[in-house]
Every structure is written in C-alpha cells, then in structure tokens.
Amino acid sequence: MSVIRLQGETEKWKGLYYQLDSGDEPIGVGGMGQVFKGTCVNEHTGATRPVAIKFMFDDLPPHAIERARREASIQLRNDNLVEMLGFIEIAERTQYGDVKMHYHVVSELLTGVSLSDLMEGKTTDRDGVGVPFAEKLLADYQNDSEHFARTVVMNILSGLMALHDAGYIHRDIDPSNIMITQDGHIKLIDFGIAKQMNTLTTNDKGLTVAGKFLGKPEYAAPELVLGDIRHQNQTTDIYAMGILLYQCIVGHTPFEGPRHEILEQQLKTKLPLSAVHN
C-alpha cells in the first residue's frame, strides 16, 4: 500500500505536509468530494496530528472550487468551531501534455455524532463507538429539553460569536452542521456557504447558479429565502439559532412540509411560539 503525500505552497513555507494511505476507504462522501482520514506531519519536529482531507471531485464548476477555497480560508481556533487547516492545489501533467488540477480541503478530524443524529437517538460515532457526552445530552433531550437546549445553544453561540467577530456569517446553521465530539465539545461545522460580510456581492445571494436556495429552508431567515444580500448579516445566523432553540425544546422545527411551503411560511407566518410553553 502506497502513501499519498500532499503539500501545497503554503505547506512548504510552513514546513508541513499531509499524508494518507492510498488504499484507505473514505470516511464520508458529499456533493463536492470524498473525505479521508489523514495525518498532518511537521517536517521540522516530526509532530503529527490526525486530519480530515476532502478530495474534491474532478470537473466541478469554478464557483464550487471557489466556495471550497473560501471555506478553507476561515481558519479560526475556537472550541466550538471546526478548525480549517488548508486548501491544497496540485497540478498534474497528463500524458497529453495538459495540466489537470486537483483540489483538497483539510480540516481537523472530528469524531462523534451530529446533533441531528443525536436528536434521532443515535449516540455512537461512525465506527460504532459510544460518545459519552452525546449519551448525556440525549438523556437531557429526553428528560429536560430546556437544559439540553441551553447547553447546545450556548456552546454554538460561543463559536458563532467568534465567527462573527472575524467578520463572517455562517448562513447554514442546522443540526446536521453541529457535531458532538468524542472529546466533549459541541462544534459548528461546514463553512461551505459562509461569507465575509464586507465582501457580500450580488453573486452571494445564497443561491446556486440555477437560482436554487442553498441552505436548509427550515432554518432560513427571510433575507436568505429572498436572496436579499443587503440584509444578510449576523442576525441571519441569529434567526437560525432561534429556530434551533425552538427545535431543541419542542422536538421539531416550527415549519414543516414540502420545501416550497416551508420557504413561503418563513416569509409570511409568525413563529408558533406558544408551542415552547406547552
């Protein structure tokens, strides 16, 4: 079994490289690529740390590559945020003399369970190993939902404040983008459609090229639904946090149904807050 070594220009300057075994199976697959477990190696000290390396699919459109590059650039250290480590571009010369680019996104390796899975009763990681903190949180969710909600929301708000202080908005907060880790943290992940507020343009409405809304409709603030970039700011994320708080207490989101109906309700219907007090 051979070892794959990845090192971009930034990594060369820092004296770092990433490696993984070529025969390893992916630990995750998404719409943009496959994720593998790898190792970050310091060339000077020999120190290592486990990392997650996303091998992006070939032939992705330029806007998808740029989105991944932007995600990898949000490199903040906070107990409640996933740590992004780098974006690596590798140029390969084909047998025909052409240059083919390969792109990789590197982040810290998280093991645990997503909040969405936890709320469905799952407390084991991808290897089937129990996550003690998740087991405690599940007991709270089942027996004291308000305490559960406070724990989750206060932790995510801590990470979100760091993100906002750095000038970014997340724009895709929902339970599938929150991880309960083996080492006892609650982390906000997936900065795929996050954006610096001072660089928002008409190309950053939160829509795909075809005009399809990118985020989760159940958690989308009206300005996201409308693609109104003028009013996308920290309160866009706070709206999603309010929906998350509601869900943690009540057990479901305020608006349910077909996607188009949920988007319409976000624009026209007041949140049914009476359910929180029942």
Can you say where each PLM-predicted feature lies in the sequence?
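Short beta-strand micro-motifs within the conserved protein kinase catalytic domain, predominantly
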Residues: 83-101
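Protein kinase glycine-rich loop
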Residues: 23-30, 35
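Protein kinase catalytic-loop region centered on the HRD/HxD motif
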Residues: 158-168
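Conserved short submotifs of the Hanks-type protein kinase catalytic core
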Residues: 97-114, 118
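Activation segment signature within eukaryotic-like protein kinase domains
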Residues: 152-153
